[in-house]
From Swiss-Prot:
Membrane topology, from the record: Multi-pass membrane protein
Source organism superkingdom: Bacteria
Annotated EC: 2.7.8.13
Gene from which the chain derives: mraY
InterPro entries, per the entry: Glycosyl_transferase_4, PNAcMuramoyl-5peptid_Trfase, PNAcMuramoyl-5peptid_Trfase_CS
Keyword Transmembrane: yes
Organism: Desulfitobacterium hafniense (strain Y51)
Sequence intervals crossing the membrane: 5-25, 50-70, 78-98, 114-133, 145-165, 177-197, 200-220, 236-256, 262-282, 311-331
Protein known as: Phospho-N-acetylmuramoyl-pentapeptide-transferase
Family, similarity comment: Belongs to the glycosyltransferase 4 family. MraY subfamily.
GO molecular function, one term: metal ion binding
Catalytic activity: UDP-N-acetyl-alpha-D-muramoyl-L-alanyl-gamma-D-glutamyl-meso-2,6-diaminopimeloyl-D-alanyl-D-alanine + di-trans,octa-cis-undecaprenyl phosphate = di-trans,octa-cis-undecaprenyl diphospho-N-acetyl-alpha-D-muramoyl-L-alanyl-D-glutamyl-meso-2,6-diaminopimeloyl-D-alanyl-D-alanine + UMP
Length: 335
C-alpha cells in the first residue's frame, strides 16, 4: 500500500512538472491572462496578464496518477472522488472561460454557480449513501459518536460541501497560497485513508481505503509540482478551474471517509478565509464600516505591511497545524 501511495505522489509530481513548461506558453499564446481587480493591493497590478486556468496542469497529473496506481481504478470510491474533483473543476473552467475568453469580468453569475455546486453536492452525498452505504450520519470529531441526521443529512452536508469548495476558491488570492494549503490538507487525507485501511475502517468502513489514500497522495504530488510554477512570482495561476477542483477533491474525500465535520478542522484556513468575507460584507452592509482592511483575510495582512511570501508561509503553517489537529480528531474516534 505504501509503495503505491509514494508512487502516486511521485508520478503526479512528475507529470505536473513536465506539463507545466508545455502548457504555460500555450495559455499565454491563447491570451488566457488573469485580470486583477483595481481595488486590491496595488502590488498585485503587476500580475495582470499572468496565464490562468493552470489548474488543468495538475488535474491531469492527479487523475492519471490516481488511476495508474489505484488497486482498482474502476472502484466506485475512485470514480466518485475523481468525479467530484472534475465536476467542480468544470464549473470553474466555465467560469474562467467566460471571464478570460469571452471577456465578461464576472464570469458565471452567482446563482448559476450555486445551482451547479448544489447539484453536484446532492449527487455526491446521495451516491455515497445509495451505492456505497455511507449512511446519513455524521461522526463527531474527537469521538466515535455517530449523529444520525436522516434526510437532513443531505442539505446539511451539501452546505458544507458548497461552503468548502468556495472557500478554497477564496483562498486562491496569493501566489502559492491555495496550492500549498491544499497540499497539507491532502496530506491529512493520506493519513486518514491509510489509518482506515490499516485499522479495518476506524470510523469509516471502506472497500478501497488505500485507493483514496492513493488519490490524496496524487493530489499532494500535483499541488507540490504546481508550486514550481505558482510560487511567487507566479508564472501561472490555477484559476477557478484549479481551486474549485481542489475543493471538490477535498469534499469528495470527506464524504467518502465520513469525515465531513473533521474537514472543517482540516480545512480550518479555508473556513477562516470564508468567515472573514462574510463578516466583512455583513459589517459593511449593516454599519458602513469594515472589520478588516480587505477580505479575504490574507489581503488584510498584506495591507498591514506583510509581504506576500510571509503571508503565504504563515497560512501554510496554519494549514499544517489544522491538518495535524484533524488527523488527531479522526484517530481519537478510532479508540
Amino acid at each position: 500500500m505504501w509503495e503505491r501511495i509514494f508512487l502516486a505522489a511521485a508520478l503526479a509530481l512528475t507529470i505536473t512538472l513536465i506539463l507545466g513548461p508545455l502548457m504555460i506558453p500555450v495559455l499565454r499564446v491563447m491570451k488566457f491572462g488573469q485580470t486583477i481587480r483595481e481595488e486590491g493591493p496595488k502590488r498585485h497590478l503587476a500580475k495582470a496578464g499572468t496565464p490562468t486556468m493552470g489548474g488543468i496542469i495538475f488535474l491531469v497529473g492527479i487523475v492519471v496518477s490516481a488511476l495508474v496506481m489505484a488497486e482498482k481504478p474502476t472502484s466506485l470510491e475512485m470514480v466518485m472522488v475523481i468525479s467530484a474533483m472534475l465536476g467542480y473543476g468544470l464549473i470553474g473552467f466555465i467560469d474562467d472561460f467566460i471571464k478570460v475568453v469571452l471577456h465578461r469580468s464576472l464570469g458565471l453569475r452567482a446563482y448559476q454557480k450555486l445551482i451547479g455546486q448544489i447539484a453536484l453536492a446532492l449527487l455526491l452525498t446521495w451516491g455515497a449513501n445509495r451505492y456505497l452505504g455511507r449512511g446519513t450520519d455524521l461522526v463527531i470529531p474527537f469521538t466515535s459518536i455517530h449523529l444520525e441526521l436522516g434526510l437532513f443529512y443531505y442539505p446539511f452536508v451539501s452546505f458544507i460541501i458548497v461552503g468548502i469548495t468556495n472557500a478554497v476558491n477564496l483562498t486562491d488570492g496569493l501566489d502559492g497560497l491555495a496550492a500549498g494549503t491544499t497540499l497539507f490538507s491532502m496530506l491529512s487525507y493520506v493519513s486518514i485513508a491509510t489509518l482506515a485501511a490499516s485499522q479495518g475502517g476506524g470510523v469509516a468502513i471502506l472497500a478501497y481505503e488505500s485507493d483514496l489514500a492513493v488519490f490524496a497522495a496524487a493530489a499532494v504530488g500535483g499541488c507540490f509540482g504546481f508550486l514550481r510554477f505558482n510560487k511567487n512570482p507566479a508564472r501561472v495561476f490555477m484559476g477557478d478551474t484549479g481551486s474549485l477542483a481542489l475543493g471538490g477533491a477535498l469534499v469528495g474525500l470527506a464524504v467518502l471517509t465520513k469525515t465531513e465535520l473533521i474537514l472543517l478542522i482540516i480545512g480550518g484556513v479555508y473556513v477562516v478565509e470564508a468567515i472573514s468575507v462574510i463578516l466583512q460584507v455583513f459589517s459593511y452592509q449593516t454599519t458602513g464600516k469594515r472589520i478588516f482592511r480587505m477580505s479575504p483575510l490574507h489581503h488584510h495582512f498584506e495591507l498591514g505591511g506583510w509581504n506576500e511570501w510571509r503571508v503565504v508561509m504563515v497560512f501554510w503553517l496554519a494549514s499544517l497545524l489544522c491538518g495535524v489537529l484533524g488527523v488527531t480528531a479522526y484517530m481519537a474516534g478510532m479508540f
